């Protein structure tokens, strides 16, 4: 590539962020609202940095989001919101600095460039129709999804994750916090580092694998009585208990359990270092 073409291409790349900049909302307001319609089966994703994200059902088949800033004594006008609508999905991000931007869906939607020196928080509550897929994401703050979610993705770093009465598959993760999931239809994947994992499924769809992990905490898994899987459980300092037949090895130190339930099929993995593992029938 000659120098002229190289610098022309570089200019396009440097201009791309400006061309794709999103409109900013709520800089001058302590409370910001967004109301809109998202069709059943589409994703409603919300990303926060400091603060909670809570989903609950709406009563009018619309989406209603309320974001409330809470100051630590410093100005909050650098905190704003961006909305991305693409392919029928909606992503809303709380933005703390001008080097960040919101993108369409997925866990990479919020790119944080530079340091977040404003330690104020934003509380985000969202009411959605029950048939939506929902994503609740934060960094420093708990996330919860209650009575909604044809599919749920919920994650944070510092805080608990709670998913109650979802109607479809769930992926829930934390680092410092407990993870509790209850859904009418799995599969479920749930992980943390410091905290317990509790996952309950009234039924299962498809044949996707499931994984449950923690380091400092226990893992409890509740599945239907008619359940098929190939499983492996591993713990270092803890016991293994099951309502289903299993082969247990290692009386002292690391303990392992593996086997087949029913006709096998999906892989079920659970592990802890400092905690017990239990598989229960419900």
Roles of regions detected by a PLM:
Residues 1-282:
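Intrinsically disordered, low-complexity terminal regions
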